[in-house]
Amino acid sequence: MRINMGIQKKLCAVVLLLSMLQSTMIYAEERVYGITEYGPVSVNGNGVGRGQDPTYQYIEDLLYNRQGNSNPSGTNPTPGTTSAPANPGVQNNGGGNTATTQERKWNLAKLSKSGQTKTIASEVNANYVVVFDLDQGTILGEKNSSATMNPASMTKVMTLLVAVENLPDLEKKLTITQDIVDFVKARGASNCGFVAGEQVRVKDLLYGVILPSGADAVLALAKEVAGSEAGFVALMNKKAQDLGLSSECRFQNASGLYHSTHHMTVKDMGEIMAAAMRNSLAREVLSTENYQIPATNKHGNGIKLTNLFIQRIKTQDTGGASVTMAKTGFVRQSMFCSVSSGKGGNGKNLLVVTGYSSSTWQCIMDHAALYKRFG
């Protein structure tokens, strides 16, 4: 019996995937079936960041019938640069990092449903959903938007915001310490692939927090800002109060690792994202698809980082929407979640938050469906 060549390739991909699951590569908690929020953690020290393992990328290309080019533009970003979409009027101010692109008009966390708010049912897989119209300050659609959930690595949007507001010198180099490496390894946490003794610029660490969801970058920045993660978390909770988030919003760590009292609502997450979007540097980081960390003392070729949500949603039917900013997350208690922002096909500026989707790709498809429906 002759087997179709396409089927043969997919069978080979499955075999490779199974062999990878039995390898010595370290996986974070979200590595269900080897297909994750982004992909396997790289610990081989060869400059390949999380989600950029070439074997894994080859497998995904086969499974999803892609051409095997992880950078759709066909080019590699220059070290220390990005391939972010243009944001008119947004500049990296390089110091202070408190410049805003727009004034706050409303608190998304405190918005209530209106008569025009649509109830979102079975058309998306996620259990927690909110869709905001940023132009009108309204909730277009929702599902359990006032219920408490664990934000997982969406937490890192607040981490980014607090860091940029407290670190004026983007060129300062911080050292990745052995305790950071040990912490990440012990918990199987998402990381950028930094090693002990590596010296990395603050600017590069900021991108490392968001694009590969790097806990190593988070801990280095937290220590620099507040002396410890606990001190940094106190600043995060203070920022939550300043933003007027709900009483359900509480941080226990800076990476989004599961804790029973680390939680918020999807509306809270929406306001955190909106606050980050008002900061020019945070907005730039969140809207970057590819970023090249330049050579360090430990990685001679630097490290390439990719926001795979932004990359992958381009393959989905969004009804003409352009999704330009995103941060994903996973813990078992809230499954796959994401916050994103973009312009709908009809010109509406939307912000979407979902929680408890069943898989990486289901989360992406949920967002695509919501942009198509409400954009």
Each predicted region: which residue ranges?
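Bacterial N-terminal signal peptides that target proteins for export
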Residues: I3-C12
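Structured C-terminal helix/loop/strand segments within mature extracytoplasmic catalytic/sensor domains
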Residues: M25-G141, S145-M149, L167-P168, K173, ...
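Conserved active-site loop region of the serine DD-peptidase/beta-lactamase
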Residues: R278-G319
